[in-house]
Amino acid sequence: MNKSITINTSHDRQSLLIILSDPKFVLPKLFPPIKEVEVENDSFNAHGRFMAMSFNMHGNVLRGADLVYAFYLSAGGGMGQGKLTMRIKEREINLEFEYDGWMERMSGIFFMDRWFSGFARRLDEDVRMERIKRKI
């Protein structure tokens, strides 16, 4: 499954890099079924429920020219892997999601489109509030 979206924002690149490199900020906002995120250094472990099934997502945040969330997703014996890439420019974010695994059948285009459009619609305000909270 591949999904990409371009998001326009009023925030500068440096502030976006700081906030969007935090899995506790990004993951629950992009994937609403995620209810808990634990972070240790550049690794994350997220838990949630989707369609009555508990799942676990674990991976790493790679920081370079792009922000990359490389992850494994598991639930009830099913496994998948994916990558979320954020190309952050001044006032614009190109978001690319790639995933191959068991959840592809369940989440499909309907949920992913809804989640991504909701993330894009709310991002500017969510980042604004997070900048206030963190004093960035």
Model-derived features: positions:
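Short, Lys/Arg-enriched, disordered terminal segments
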Residues: M1-N8, R128-I136
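Glycine-rich portal/gate segments that line the openings of hydrophobic small-molecule binding cavities
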Residues: P28-F31, K35-G76
